Amino acid sequence: MKFLLFIFTTILFSQSEITDSRNNAVTNSIKIASPAVASINVTQVQKYSINPLQRDPWFEYFFSPQIRQKEVKGSGSGVVISPDGYILTNDHVVENASKIIVTLPGGKEYNAEVIGMDNLTDLALLKVDGKNFPFIEMANSNELIIGEWVIALGNPFGLFDMNQQPTATIGIISGKDLDFGLQ
């Protein structure tokens, strides 16, 4: 009986050590940041011609172009950066969007409005109505150290819509103050 109690106690203690060792800076950061990750679903209206010959100027001279429209769905990721619903995402995700739906962990959906876009840096700022959103505070990128760990959370391929949790990956800061000619 004492032997079984010893084994049971040892197993519990070992399990506790394993659990404690798995809780580290990366897993804790993901736990803290995940509620602020947003899934961005967009609808874009794209125009197309129904006949490839319409691109020929001679054909268009005699026949008026017949342009059709279709809705195209797309998705991406964003992050809530303020408690009043400002969300940072990529310009290419929301470019030409006629409708933007933001989904937060837990499945709550919001209609979003584009506040600003910058094609050069591929950034866009969205706004959803509401208050007290979980958010991530922006830090000073000048304080980063080359080789420091970084974590990316997101919504590749719309996976967020299936399980309402962002995916995670890690890497390192590989460079700072790089000039890509963006002016």
What do the predicted segments below correspond to?
Residues 15-183:
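Serine-dependent protease modules
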